[in-house]
Amino acid sequence: MPERDPILLTPGPLTTSRMTRDAMLRDWGSWDAAFNRLTKSVCADLVRIAGGGDAYVCVPLQGSGTFAVEATLGTLVPRDARVLVPNNGAYCARIAAILRRLGVAHVELPFAEDEPASAHAIDAALARDARLTHVALVHLETSAGLLNPLDDIAAVCRARGKALIVDAMSSFGALPIALAASGIDALISASGKCLEGVPGMGFAIVRRSALEAAEGRSPSVALDLHDQYAYMQRTSQWRFTPPTHVLAALRAALDQFFDEGGQPARGARYARNCATLVDGMRALGFEPFLDARAQASVIVTFYAPADPAYAFPAFYAAVRDAGYVLYPGKLTTADTFRVGCIGALGADEMRGAVAAIGGALESLGIAMR
């Protein structure tokens, strides 16, 4: 008997629907008109979800979400710019690492791993250093599941006349975002997150005027968003071999996204998943790392058991044997693990995950205190 696919309680890759997986059973010619129409429809819908209107365009890119983050920073940020990076986790630090590699001056504004970035502190940092030209913000820091206040920070950037680039990798599709009148220059996400597609394609939704001003700026050929967009405008094609099956799966996932009711319905389902998970885990004795006011309903970080019998590899394996895949912790200040609430899942799967975790505690002899 074939093994049942595990349920992925991770922030991407994640459990996808049968319809999304079935969409990958067809082969596509990368220069074919039908595939070009598929690309165009996906890009139009991504701008629509972001509330961008005619002022924004979508540029898809082969690879993981980090490819799209690096491409966006390398394309939109001039080499003589100076970027403020609010930092409360590993994905904020990754932005700083990319800027360092690009040779772009940047200033990290540190926050604790359980502390949302403060719009007031960002405003003060911009006031102190007139050389700062951009802010690069992670909307949802997946290290802990921490939500940063995008609207408040965008308002500060508008008032200060600073360009804002947003990594919305783990929030786009689940949380409300409206680009029109936001002042955001670019929003970056990927196929395999809250849109419930499969991994393999990132994308940037960019203010048209900012992209058009970036010709020739990227130090990379493959990661040049301006060149990618200009080529697509001329030919309707990708510059290099596209992830055809990934795009087809994303088209199917977007159809299901709209059928479900779009972002409000998707976000509400994830919120129910999160509440079911947290309530069940608390009943087992686990406590979330974050205060509820800072917690996004996409992934929850829990403190690891204090019992010496606990070791994450064995705990992970026991839960995996029960059919659920957890995610290791990524914090520097506490021993934790993470449980995702996204994907083609509902409250029943969350209850099943809690039962599997409870079973792992019992089988491994781990006491909760």
Swiss-Prot record:
| Quaternary context | Homodimer.
Sequence positions bearing N6-(pyridoxal phosphate)lysine: K193
Q: What is its EC number?
A: 2.6.1.37
Reactions that this protein is recorded to catalyse: (2-aminoethyl)phosphonate + pyruvate = phosphonoacetaldehyde + L-alanine
Q: What is this protein called?
A: 2-aminoethylphosphonate--pyruvate transaminase
Q: What this chain does, per the record?
A: Involved in phosphonate degradation.
Cross-referenced Gene3D superfamilies: Aspartate Aminotransferase, domain 1, Type I PLP-dependent aspartate aminotransferase-like (Major domain)
